[in-house]
Amino acid sequence: MRIEIKLLPLQDNPVIPFNYNYELYSQIVEKAGAIEPRIVKLLESPHGYWTFSRIIIRKREIIPEKGIKILSDDISLYISSSNKEIIKGIVEGIEKSPEFKIGDVGFLVADIKALKSKEIKNVNIFSTLSPIVVRTVKFEGDKLKHWDLYPHDELFLDRLRKVMLLRYHEVMGDLPEDKDFRIELIKFKPTRLIVKDSYIRGSLMVFRYYGSKEIAKFGYENGFGEKTNLGFGMVKIIEEQ
């Protein structure tokens, strides 16, 4: 299930920071938890029971070293999960407390609407609404460190497959019948964001997906890759001409 939240800035000439994922995540979890405390554990789970998009600003100006100046009347945030109780808790929490703060800018929720589900096929074109994060671990000296992977890295697809199967099993309770898929990269842009106190590198991508419909549907609903609950891995479907 997927929703769109319209937000109205409460200040003139609003400028939001480039790094806002953790602020949004914390406020969404707090609002939903105030209504339905039992879903907080799911919202905080690293297995990614849900995902959300970057803030969609249809008219904007990038101000280097400062942030994004909002030139449109409103902005949009998309949230998705295969778990209807999660979406219900988020919606009810936001309706009860319809204010958000991003950086120094306050926002008021103007509208929340459910979006129609798209048909998932064996071949789909996906475009990211937030960067896809795929990581591995490597030794540097005597220390084990996380290493972020991009689509051109040899380990990217293998690691993405493993992550999606692990998350599918944890969230859905079993494994998909068809476990195999591959992707064909169409467009790619690397990103680096600060989440809490850590740098996370991800991939904004347009890609053609081939294979398991179950994993495709799971990724569409809950996000592709890792850290989806922190606002990574959300995709939309592009209709092929």
Curated annotation (Swiss-Prot):
Q: Which domain of life is it from?
A: Archaea
Subunit-level organization? Binds crRNA.
- Which Gene3D superfamilies does the record associate with it? 3.30.70.1890, 3.30.70.1900
Q: Which GO terms describe its biological process?
A: defense response to virus
Q: What does this protein do?
A: CRISPR (clustered regularly interspaced short palindromic repeat), is an adaptive immune system that provides protection against mobile genetic elements (viruses, transposable elements and conjugative plasmids). CRISPR clusters contain sequences complementary to antecedent mobile elements and target invading nucleic acids. CRISPR clusters are transcribed and processed into CRISPR RNA (crRNA), also called psiRNA (prokaryotic silencing) in this organism (Potential).
Output the Gene Ontology terms for molecular function: hydrolase activity, acting on ester bonds; RNA binding
What's the protein here called? Putative CRISPR-associated endoribonuclease-like protein Cas6
For this chain, the family text in UniProt reads: Belongs to the CRISPR-associated protein Cas6/Cse3/CasE family.
Provide the alphabetized UniProt keywords. Antiviral defense, RNA-binding
Is the Membrane keyword given for this protein? no
Q: Which Pfam families match?
A: Cas6_I-A (PF21350), Cas_Cas6_C (PF01881)
Record has Membrane as a keyword: no
Q: Which gene encodes it?
A: cas6b
